[in-house]
Amino acid sequence: AKQIKLLGLSGTYVQMLTENIPNFRTVAAPFGLGYVPGPWMQSIQVSKGITSVKQGYEAMTGQINIEYRKPQMLEADWINLNVYTNSKGRIEGNADATLKMKDNRWGTTLLVHYDKDLSTHDENNDGFQDMPKTEQVNVMNRWTFLSDTYEFQIGARYLNENRHSGQLESSIVNPYLINLETNRIEGFMKNGFMWNDARESSLALILSGSYH
């Protein structure tokens, strides 16, 4: 699992946020960063030490916030494709499409990711896989609306991942195997109201939910 340690601790002691919304809690915490494809990221912010409880109480040693690509980005392409492979037998494919409408006030982005490990690794020849073989499908769609006094965002995401590890099946008759299948659905909505007579004043309503 991909984790970042802050002040020597990881897991539940580090709060994971996506666009300032608490995410990847409980059973999703060990694999949180693995659920975020790199090409989807617009930016990442890391805060070390105890932070504000504005987004929750979990940030004991730090906080990691990930910002996804947004339709209003100046560099947002209409469509972007990315393919990656390496000598260890890993393949990845990424695609994102952006559509801007009505003077760039309305916009939508579709993000798609797929990766798979084709090879089994046992470099020390102990009969156990050195790392799990994974296959992941990740799809996200978001809509945004921006005006002078109101901002609105809504999005949904689906993830399916399979992890296989344990003993090599060719090395023993009844091998010890580990199979972990994850199905995760997320949804979020963000509303922001700003007043013309006091730009420093605003009101926000943020809703989110997930099924894992």
Give residue spans per PLM region:
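Flexible, glycine/serine/threonine-rich loop segments and coil->beta-strand junctions
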Residues: 1-41, 48-65, 73-76
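Hydrophobic, lipid-facing positions within transmembrane beta-strands of outer-membrane proteins
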Residues: 2, 12, 60-62, 77-79, ...
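Transmembrane beta-barrel domains of outer membrane proteins
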Residues: 7, 47, 67, 96-100, ...
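Outer-envelope beta-barrel architecture signal
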Residues: 14, 75-79, 91, 102-108, ...
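Short strand-turn segments of transmembrane beta-barrel domains in outer membranes
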Residues: 43-45, 51-55, 63, 68-100, ...
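Membrane-embedded beta-strand positions of outer-membrane beta-barrel proteins
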Residues: 44, 79-83, 108-112, 141, ...
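Outer-membrane beta-barrel pore domains and translocons
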Residues: 49, 67, 82-88, 100, ...
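Flexible loop and strand-edge segments within Gram-negative outer membrane beta-barrel domains
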Residues: 117-138, 146-201, 209-212
